[in-house]
Amino acid sequence: QEKYGQGSVATSLTAKMENLALNAIYLLGTPGPKMIWQMGELGYNYNKWCTPEGVDKTDTGEYETSRKPVKWDYLQVPERKALYDVYCKMNQLRNNNPELFGASSKFTWTPSGWPVKTMDLSKDGKVVHVFANYHGISAEAKTISIPSGTWTDYLTGESVSGGSYTLVSGKALVLVNSSVK
């Protein structure tokens, strides 16, 4: 993100972790098996050419498969802990509702929607609606239309009613119906 990110995503830890959380929601919200790479749930920011001590050796091409620093202290950083919590909740959603993530579930999405991407999953009366605002400018909120009814945001536990909703930049809603565990 530091190399290719634009605006605050390249410079702000908060924006980076929010963006990574949106990516995690989209990765873990799609059906099929998943792999989390090397402390990605904490926003790990050492590249593959880093030594076990954390020294970047990109220019040498060495250390690609060597041990990497384990950064459990990242859990003490609120922005990184928030990212970790998103991974936990999304994995909990997957583990408690495996039928939603199997080949026979109904799945639709707008991966190219900008700035708000959406995803819908359903199976056997269980329904999940995901809305993620990828806009990089923190002041850029978007109005979305939530399906009618009362939903629970799986990430926060808050109740959300259908209708218009203002989704701020860098945030997501993972709305579930009462059948979802």
What is each model feature region?
Residues Q1-S8, L28-P78:
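Aromatic/acidic polysaccharide-binding cleft in carbohydrate-active enzymes
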Residues S145-G157:
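Solvent-exposed beta-hairpin/edge-strand motifs
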